[in-house]
Curated annotation (Swiss-Prot):
Keyword Secreted: yes
Record's protein name: Extended FMRFamide-3
Main location: secreted
One biological process term in Gene Ontology: neuropeptide signaling pathway
Family, per entry: Belongs to the FARP (FMRF amide related peptide) family.
Modified residues (Leucine amide): L9
C-alpha cells in the first residue's frame, strides 16, 4: 500500500 512508499524512503 501507500504506506510502503514512506518506508522505502
Amino acid at each position: 500500500g501507500p504506506e510502503t512508499a514512506f518506508f522505502r524512503l
